[in-house]
Amino acid sequence: MNRHLVAGVALVSLSMTLTVARAFSPTIATVGQAVGAANGNSGAEPCARSPICAWGRGRDVITHEVRPPDMGFTYAYPFALPDGLTGGIAAVAINSKQHLFAFQRNPAGTPQLFEFDRNHQRVRAIGNDAIGHQNKAHGMAIDAEDNIWICDEHGDTVMKLSPEGKLLMTLGIKGQRGDWDESKGQRLLWQPLHVAFAPNGDIYIGMGHANESPNDTDKSPTNSSGAARVLHLDKNGAYINQWFGNKAGQGHFSMVHGLAVNPDNGNVYIGDREEYRLVVYDRRGTFVRTIQMRNLVCGLYVDPHHQLWMATGQDGQIFRIDWDGNILGAIGNGPGRGEGQFIESNYMAMDLEGNLYTGDTSVARITKMVAPRSERWIDVHT
């Protein structure tokens, strides 16, 4: 199937309340200011070891937006996945050869990582002999040397693969969830979701679904915080720093579902999905500011032109935003399974022609968003 649909402005019919807005200026709270009721935080101290009960969920207190798609992208579905594999596509990434990799949630004994050439042809699967079964495929990223990094949320590992698909490094221990604690010689991960890289090759790992389940959090004897976190390692996997989001309020977060590094200044952007916001730190983990959004922040991506993109997950759109959180354009027709729609898109990739790609965790398909060849788009990208 290779269908196209011009991005229009018609909105889908939805069962939840949605607001259409052609212009939105995000609320920005900097150091010393309170986000307050906008994100549902009560300001109270977090519950013992399970901070989830101290947070007001953004889904419940913030009105969602579906914006008119205004960037002129069209939609195509040229990638053929293997017959019989119906798992959702957790993530996609593109290497320097312009080959696309897709990370699929498939059952044990079936492949989960696929490579497609620039003509959309599937050229290989990286098998379980290299990566084992990924209990819950989540984020994926490709570094400057074309190494492939994959996150197994429920297996609690992050794996680094060579461009040829050979396993080079495993961070964490499969099936052992907990803290990374250098003082104990304990190097465990807690539901890793995504990976991002600093300009010097340093690694940032976002971990965050732990906060969704207090019972799960409290049952782990190896974990002392039960909190979402960012782990900072050097390019060889040596520990540098980490910071936690185990309190409500400024400088904290409930989830690290999206993660991106500004290549120009090294600032780390966290997509705090359930609080509908970006939380920004410098490269050393010092809090910079919070930027309140009006949608789920499910994925963040920096394109080859150093532009920032945000996936709204179950809100069914992708936004181009600036580094201050201002929405510059929208792609997608809202939640659904139709053309130009998404049930839950999280992670993206862009080729050198400006085409954008994403998967869907609930649908076994990869969407190619074909960039318009307009003067506006050329101006943006040059």
Identify what each model region corresponds to.
Residues R22-T382:
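Sequence-structural signature of mature extracellular/luminal beta-sheet repeat domains
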Residues M1-H4:
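Positively charged n-region of N-terminal signal peptides that target proteins for export
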Residues G8-T17:
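Bacterial N-terminal signal peptides
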